């Protein structure tokens, strides 16, 4: 995507208890890190450096692209941090709003106050750095009709499903608590949305 002029901007949601309430045996759980991520990963390091502030993460990443002479005018935002659907709704909405806000004021010397998610998304249509997509990650068993409506409201354009395996006996051994039938149902709901 980068060679076609689209910057991929990976950002992390904050590492609170609600980043994922499940206890899959293989999932890393480092202190002060979102569940399933380790501090050595580049996106995690950037997020921690910016205290998991959404806007600061975006500004840091886009600035690094611009500093190397790469175009910095449009990007796909990849939202990491565990199970998006497990975050509190008000925090998720604020985080999604701040994506657009950060991109809208990226090149402004003085940063204005934040507006609503819908207002920021509308302004972004003519901003110097346009958001062309938002990718979130979640578990297949968290997909519901209501959750898809929430994704639409948040301007989510792509959903990465954490499909860890398709053999239910293995899923049970690793304490996944999300089985093949859940995956099929979640994929079907997303496909038909």
Question: Which stretches of residues belong to each language-model region?
Answer:
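Cys/His-coordinated zinc-binding microdomains
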Residues: 28
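Conserved non-cysteine loop/helix-boundary elements of the Radical SAM core domain that shape
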Residues: 39-57, 77, 81-193
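N-terminal [4Fe-4S]-dependent radical SAM core
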Residues: 1-23, 31-59, 63-65, 70-71, ...
């Amino acid at each position: 995507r980068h060679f076609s002029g689209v910057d991929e901007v990976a950002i992390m949601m904050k590492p609170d208890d609600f980043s994922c309430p499940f206890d899959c045996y293989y999932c890393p759980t480092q202190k002060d890190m979102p569940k399933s991520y380790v501090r050595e990963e580049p996106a995690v390091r950037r997020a921690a450096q910016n205290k998991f502030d959404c806007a600061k993460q975006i500004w840091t990443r886009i600035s690094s692209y611009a500093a190397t002479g790469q175009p910095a005018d449009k990007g796909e935002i990849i939202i990491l941090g565990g199970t998006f659907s497990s975050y509190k709704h008000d925090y998720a909405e604020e985080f999604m709003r701040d994506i657009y806000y950060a991109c809208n004021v990226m090149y402004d010397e003085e940063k204005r106050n934040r507006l609503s998610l819908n207002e920021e998304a509308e302004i972004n249509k003519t901003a110097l750095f346009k958001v062309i997509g938002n990718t979130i990650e979640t578990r297949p068993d968290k997909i519901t009709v209501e959750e898809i409506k929430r994704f639409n409201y948040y301007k989510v354009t792509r959903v990465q499903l954490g499909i860890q395996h398709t053999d239910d006996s293995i899923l049970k051994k690793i304490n996944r608590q999300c089985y093949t039938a859940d995956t099929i149902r979640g994929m079907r709901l997303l496909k038909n949305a």
